[in-house]
Amino acid sequence: MEKFEGYSEKHKSRQQYFVYPLLFQEYIYAFAHDYGLNDFEPVEIFSCNNKKFSSLLVKRLIIRMYQQSFWMNSVNHPNQDRLLDYKIGFYSEFYSQILSEGFAIVVETPFSLRELPCPKEKEIPKFQNLHSIHSIFSFLEDKFVHLDYLSHIEIPYPIHLEILVQLLQYRIQDVPSLHLLRFFLNNYSNWNSFITSMKSIFLLKKENKRLFRFLYNSYVSEYEFFLLFLRKQSSCLPLAASGTFLERIHFSKKMEHFWIMYPGFFRKTIWFFMDPLMHYVRYQGKALFASKGTPFLNKKWKWYLINLWQYCFSFWTQPRRIHLNQLANSCFDFMGYLSSVPKSPFLVKNQMLDNSFLIDTLIQKLDTIVPATALIGYLSKAQFCTGSGHPISKPIWTDLSDWDILDRFGRICRNLFHYHSGSSKKRTLYRLKYILRLSCARTLARKHKSTVRTFMQRLGSAFLEEFFTEEELVFSLMFTKTTLCSFRGSHSERIWYFDIIRINDLVKPLN
């Protein structure tokens, strides 16, 4: 009990007191502008030519906010011309989006800084070096092979956006800032009603990615607060007594009251054990919870999460969003890989004096493969091939130059190999390379109105080199006369790269 109170107080100490006038200071917007430029987002979103995060533009918008005529014209304009109404509405929505993005940058800065604790004598490492998607799979290889059960969790979305605002009250105690956040959310259409479809969620993500990501991460970190505490204590809670742990605000009072009414009750029904074989991994909206123990214990964890979302976050989630399976007899789709931990036979030679024995044993090893059918399906949607995987030309790219077409196809191929380098079976990757390479050849042949064979003979080895992966480039430098086909199967081992900070675009629908 004392451990939870100390842990909770430590969590409360992270609450930020945002002074409302600071949102209107010029240096804050200059800092937000620089923060947006130097962030880990793609270059096409934050660039020096992007005027969305201009501090001068935001400052002018703040000044216009005080002008009542601006808001009157933006909201109430029944007698205006339709074209003028459209322009005013467009600019009003555009200004609101700029302000909400700037607000999200200012608010999320303290949360991002506290996630990077570092001693003063050491230089703070770059953010890109701290997070790699492939590092998750290295963790799975090291930890999951020793576990028995796996829960595949689809984290539900909150029913109403007001729940997200209320969750921020634990960390932000500045009421005007919360009202400003409500203003941004209510400025979108239909946000006063319940969100009942993923289409509305996607609309908010599309119009204001940074603000939605900040709210969603705040919600996820709040629910993981409970899970992290129980993970650190490795507590085993009976289902009948788990209701006393669900409401965080009155947690301590309920525990004290329950202890007075039922002295000695927790000694019999709640017991703690230190079990290091319990691991939790999350990426975006999917999470994996693996543990060792009995099926009954893992089912209790499942219902604990369901009750947590229901009583703590005021929305009910369906039990089918949490799939509990034996790790050795199931596979899970996570971050574009179809992974499993099968038991494989392994022969061990044992030497005893003059006699030797072969011992047949079973070992567990993480197996990661690429879902070929799904990837070919998304390649067909992008018009690189048919639904059956037959390569076709890309007519929309025929207006580009030859080297631009080669560069685009080669970059897509190298990115696929780079992201899926951890696949246990490379045959699927080479099939995808064949589709992209032949699609590129058909596109070039269509542009020049010739046959594929003629065009490939004219380009020669330069055409193949555009589709070389990083591993194949190393082999081509070592053996200059080696062709692509000769070392295709030379490197079937899995390789995890630690410079991948975002998921591949073709894998996003799979996630």
Curated annotation (Swiss-Prot):
Main location: plastid
UniProt cross-references to Pfam families, sorted A to Z: Intron_maturas2 (PF01348), MatK_N (PF01824)
Any single Gene Ontology cellular-component annotation: chloroplast
Source organism, top-level taxon: Eukaryota
Key words of the record: Chloroplast, mRNA processing, Plastid, RNA-binding, tRNA processing
Cellular localisation: Plastid, Chloroplast
GO molecular function: RNA binding
Biological process (GO), any one: RNA splicing
InterPro entries: Domain_X, Maturase_MatK, Maturase_MatK_N
Annotated function: Usually encoded in the trnK tRNA gene intron. Probably assists in splicing its own and other chloroplast group II introns.
Family: Belongs to the intron maturase 2 family. MatK subfamily.
HAMAP family: MatK (MF_01390)
Protein name in the entry: Maturase K
Lineage: Eukaryota, Viridiplantae, Streptophyta, Embryophyta, Tracheophyta
Gene label: matK
